[in-house]
């Protein structure tokens, strides 16, 4: 059973469960953040998400697409081009993540975990 199939059958105690499932792990929030303002190609995402491997980026993009947070559009041209863009669900999630990112910066500075 695929990970996204398991998510659909889980019993959640509150809305944080499905939200954390959607952005769980090290990379998904960073990928969504990269797509906030405009669609991006695979290479742009790879460069924009520091430290992610090609294999992991492919896996995370597939999961985000399966969870209906982004779309993958293949342009039939030479050379082939593929773009990733946020769906309405993905855009709404990014709006929800913005205050969390603000809190994270304040928290990290206040606890000495942020160099900036």
Regions found by a protein language model. Give the residues of each.
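N-terminal intrinsically disordered/low-complexity leader segments
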Residues: 1-11
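Beta-hairpin "wing" of winged helix-turn-helix
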Residues: 65-85
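Basic amphipathic alpha-helical segments that dock to polyanions
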Residues: 57, 61-65
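Amphipathic alpha-helical dimerization/coiled-coil segments
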Residues: 2-4, 33, 88-116
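Generic structural signal for secondary-structure transition and capping sites
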Residues: 28, 40, 66-69, 102-105, ...
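N-terminal helix-turn-helix DNA-binding core of bacterial DNA-binding proteins
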Residues: 10-56, 76-77, 83, 91, ...
């Amino acid at each position: 059973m695929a990970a996204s199939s398991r998510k659909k059958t889980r019993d959640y105690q509150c809305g944080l469960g499905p939200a954390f499932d959607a952005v769980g792990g090290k990379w998904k929030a960073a990928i969504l953040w990269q797509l906030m303002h405009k669609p991006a190609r695979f290479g742009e995402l790879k460069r924009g998400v520091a430290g992610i491997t090609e294999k992991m980026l492919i896996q995370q993009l597939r999961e985000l697409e399966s969870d209906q947070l982004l779309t993958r559009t293949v342009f039939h041209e030479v050379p082939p081009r593929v773009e990733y863009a946020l769906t309405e669900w993905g855009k709404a999630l990014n709006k929800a993540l913005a205050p969390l990112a603000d809190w994270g910066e304040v928290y990290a500075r206040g606890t000495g975990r942020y160099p900036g």
